[in-house]
Design a protein with these regions (language model features):
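Active-site histidine-anchored catalytic micro-motif
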Residues: 1-144
């Protein structure tokens, strides 16, 4: 019986994409940066793992064709979790922690034919909730 080899990771470590935000709440499209890493990897079929190592930021995959969608997401989160409400955390950014918890800090996308296998209208967004700041997204590309 032939054994299937374990999936090989591309590179020994996570790669880092730097993200500079310019507003306290900002939903920033980083699809191009991630797509460039996928292309550089040479992986034809696999998975890209994305992780945000911050407690007041997150990552999501959603519509990227209309920039109003990203603005609507940020505005909706600001309405759902307003800044300055009576939170127990007293550093002034409790709302940012809650928003990051709702959005999440990780995402996974397929690699198909050497490219990101996102849906037609999908993009990858870094979600800043306590900016402006210099942030990171950790990226790991694995082949099937």
């Amino acid at each position: 019986m032939k054994e299937n080899p374990a999936p090989a990771a591309v590179g020994a470590a996570w790669q880092v994409v730097s993200v500079e935000t310019t507003a306290r709440t900002q939903i920033k499209d980083i699809t191009r940066e991630i797509a460039a890493l996928v292309k550089q990897s040479g992986v034809e079929s696999g998975v890209v793992h994305l992780y945000v190592p911050h407690t007041t930021a997150g990552i999501l995959i959603n519509e990227s064709d209309d920039p109003d969608v990203a603005r609507d997401i940020g505005d909706a989160l600001d309405r759902l979790v307003p800044r300055g409400a009576a939170y127990k955390h007293y550093e002034g950014n409790a709302d940012s922690h809650i928003k990051a918890s709702l959005v999440g800090v990780s995402a996974v996308a397929p690699i198909e034919g050497g490219k990101l296998g996102l849906g037609r209208w999908q993009g990858i967004f870094f979600c800043e909730f306590d900016g402006p700041r210099q942030r990171q997204v950790k990226v790991r590309i694995s082949r099937d």
